[in-house]
């Protein structure tokens, strides 16, 4: 009858309608998208709708009949659009007080913007999704430079919860911690010294440190093991988040995360319970990726196929999370993704305080990788 009806979880009904219209041959105004509240998205259902394309193509060939397409977990994991692999080099010049006077960042990689919206890439070849979170941060560093080197990915790329912020917070906050230790200064105090003209950021950081009862040195805990804390601060999607993680060393030197304290300023929390739930979820998501998640590609194909060879964070590994909401009254920012970026650097910085070994890649395989 000249219509196309699509039932599918998605993160952009307009994108689904445009795709369905293109494949089915009906006008986009004749496409109806019905979105069930089913499962999560986290970027997977934003623009990578090849499973929908299959369903619409089959429906076109069998007009008048309802077609259902269901992928197995193995099919889904092996035909995903993946989080981009990214590398970075950070260099800094420190002044007599140990604070940075110049910072040079070089990011190397490919990004989801180029794969999903190639028309958005300017003639300069800059993919903003690769460097977001590397610039526009609050620290008072007089001279900064951010370079981007495009290294094309042969694997299909997609959006991942917090997108470029997820990697750039790890790079940036790990390096801030490294500079603090090189200067012989406490990591929290060092950041505060760089935030003298940023009271909103400073308040969030101080709130998280106070929550945690910040300790800059490792200590012997009640379980008889050495424990240590690490901190990270990051701005993303209009919201400021500071996180402190408490860790000890487990089997093989991998971190055991006992507790996370998080302070978040998203402007004003209309629904504080929902904000806390999103923060806890985002921390679990980021921690799972930091500790475990790795897609293995062998002989040109994805070999990871199920949770047996793609482990995720277990309930037993999930730390207690203490959330403090800072209502600054500033314009409201996002909340669904903003607590993901700081968790990996907070944990890795804590491991440095514990072991003296700097973790430089994710996921964490040993105490120093």
Where are these regions (language model features)?
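Cofactor-binding beta-sheet edge motifs in enzyme active sites
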Residues: 1-369
